[in-house]
Swiss-Prot record:
Homodimer. InterPro entries: ACP_syn_III_C, ACP_syn_III_N, FabH, Thiolase-like. Residues 252-256 are annotated as: ACP-binding. It comes from the Bacteria. Belongs to the thiolase-like superfamily. FabH family. Its EC number is 2.3.1.180. GO terms for cellular component: cytoplasm. The active site is at residues 112, 251, 281. This is Beta-ketoacyl-[acyl-carrier-protein] synthase III. One of its GO terms (biological process) is fatty acid biosynthetic process.
Length: 324
């Protein structure tokens, strides 16, 4: 019986890191203010690399790690809310740069939940076809959407990319044991980035993009209530108990949010690895970056049961229970 396996993980961040102290020189904030409210100490910021550049770096790593030819790729999905352009998609750019001529490629825009949605989409497409290999990447250059004078958002975000290679293998155990996906469109105005408004009259003027804006307190309440519910639902669908989960790999938005989610689930914080202090919030890239690090440090091992969960713009939540 054929099921899917994650055969390669990879991540990449730009070389430039910006500390809280550096931010305090350009806005009214301090290292202590940022750390106590978010857990963030620094973040990586792209200088000239765009979203496709970060994703391409990850894609090349994934292929090298798995010893796979680019022509053997069947599917490339990139989760991002900071694409290079409206069109072509970031995934199409990466497909062209890789020379993966046999792969179809498209983006998924579901903000910080995007990687979870992309994993579900890739799994369903592989299982319903004769395709063998899929590349799923979360990549963001959020720094280009930030108002660097607004401390309520500028201190939170960083740039980076992470991804996995999914391949069909002969195994009796599915990769995704349970899932829970929800969209809360009535709360869409709580997180907004890149909004465009048509100009009146004709001929039209080019519209400008609005910077990132977030209702922080509302998002905190949403995350601390809806993410535990999503995780519990996915665990139940997998016919497991919360205690059966080896690690919970959550979207790295805020250390206080993660601590509260662990408390609500009644699980020890040691089962919730974090890298937010180094990376900040990297949007759809946060979950695969965290997974890559957990695998590299031999925290997550083959046979582990892990819950990957994200939340973000939409508003949206998504959880998958993986038999790693």
């Amino acid at each position: 019986m054929q099921n899917l396996r994650i055969t390669s993980t990879a991540s990449y961040h730009p070389p430039l890191n910006i500390t809280n102290q550096q931010l305090s020189t350009i806005m009214d904030t301090s290292d202590e203010w940022i750390k106590t409210r978010t857990g963030i100490h620094q973040r990586y910021i792209s200088n000239i690399e765009n979203t496709s550049d970060l994703a391409l770096n990850v894609g090349n790593q994934l292929l090298t790690n798995a010893n796979l030819k680019t022509t053997e790729l069947d599917l490339i999905i990139i989760a991002t809310m900071s694409p290079d352009a409206y069109t072509p998609s970031t995934a199409a750019i990466v497909q062209g740069e890789l020379g993966a001529k046999n792969a179809i490629a498209f983006d998924i825009s579901a903000a910080c939940t995007g990687f979870i949605y992309a994993m579900n989409t890739a799994e369903l497409m592989l299982k319903s076809s004769n395709w063998q290999n899929a590349m799923v990447i979360g990549a963001e250059v959020l720094s280009k959407l930030i108002d660097w004078k607004d401390r309520s958002t500028a201190v939170l975000f960083g740039d980076g990319a992470g991804g996995v290679l999914l391949q069909k293998t002969t195994t009796a155990t599915p990769l995704i044991l349970g899932r829970d996906l929800h969209t809360f469109g009535d709360l869409g105005d709580k997180i907004v980035a890149g909004k465009t408004t048509p100009k009146a009259g004709f001929p039209k003027q080019l519209t400008s993009l609005s910077p990132f804006a977030m209702a922080g307190r509302d998002v905190y309440r949403f995350a601390t209530h809806e993410v535990p519910r999503s995780i519990a639902s996915a665990v139940q669908q997998a016919n497991l108990k919360l205690d059966d989960i080896d690690y919970f790999l959550l979207h790295q938005a805020n250390e206080r949010i993660i601590n509260q989610i662990a408390k609500r689930l009644g699980q020890p914080i040691t089962k919730f690895p974090m890298n937010i202090s180094e990376y900040g919030n990297t949007g759809a890239a946060s979950e695969p970056i965290l997974l890559t690090q957990a695998v590299a440090h031999e925290l997550v091992k083959p046979g582990n049961i892990i819950a990957m969960s994200g939340f973000g713009g939409g508003l949206s939540t998504g959880t998958i229970i993986l038999n790693y």
